[in-house]
Amino acid sequence: MSSSFKFNYNMGDSRILVVINQRCLALPSMMSADGTCCNGDENRVIDTFSKLGFQDFVYRNMTTADLKDIVTLLTRHNHRTYSCVVVVILTDGAAVGEIKTADGSYKLRDFMTLFDVDKLRDKPKMFVVQTNRGAKIRRNHCKHASCQCLMYSSSERGGLRRIYSVIGWLCKVFGRSSSSPQFASQQLACLNYTLPVRETIVIYSYVDAFVLYGDTDVGSPVIYELCTALDKFGKSCNILTAITMMQHKVAKYVPAALPVVHMNCTRLMHYGDAPNDVTPSKATITTMIDGCSVILEEEGELSDDDGELRTASK
């Protein structure tokens, strides 16, 4: 790696996380007193990014006008102090490329364009969009719109792999799988059309299923695995490594939820404390390889030859 390669952006202390939680709009009768019906993903992303130094702003059940006003206010009045922006959108019942709002829907492209302002254009931005068409199963037995208790009792919810495998099967039986070539190309075309902003990473997962992902405790597979990867590697490696680890886990256990990842970054996006214009040392690279190998060993996917090769690299 060239010494002139910028290992990360010049990250300051002003990092913001914007969470747009529109999930209740799919099943308004299930809305709780605080305006939510599924807190798993929201709570997890706030916890993970707060550890990485992000200040969070949470908005729920917005109308189209309110959504425009809030994002415009954030970008126009405070963007000069931001060094990084992460936006997480949780929305159910929306079409591909749209965000469900209290009075209709809002195009994802139009939403992202709000961040295309001069002082923010060349700063790192990441959009994570988790959207599900679901909400087709009646849930009169439970106050939570996206609970999984129709399959398992609360005492069994720790078995993530088992739950995810059942949900993935239901997606194939009752809805179209997002892993099919036709649907994957539809997602990718949507992303190519809705990426008008520079220095941006978009993680877009659309599950056309009859079952809502988003258990109140566990959360959706994509959000869960992304946050798990960032908890482990968020301060020691660039964001693309964490995204790759997320993709690896989702592809293995819940292929129907595998997101499309699109980017137009010119530098590595790094949320840690590494200084700018620094080439990672051999020791740093070895530590990152070891960390990734531990996960692969736990999954039984690291062969003896791989282990010998890793030892030789040291």
UniProtKB/Swiss-Prot annotation:
GO biological process, one term: positive regulation of neuron apoptotic process
GO terms assigned for molecular function: cysteine-type endopeptidase activity
InterPro entries tied to this protein: Caspase-like_dom_sf, Pept_C14, Pept_C14_caspase, Pept_C14_p20, Pept_C14A
Top-level division of the source organism's lineage: Viruses
Functional description taken from the UniProt entry: May be involved in viral replication.
Similarity annotation: Belongs to the peptidase C14A family.
Name listed for the protein in its UniProt record: Caspase-like protein
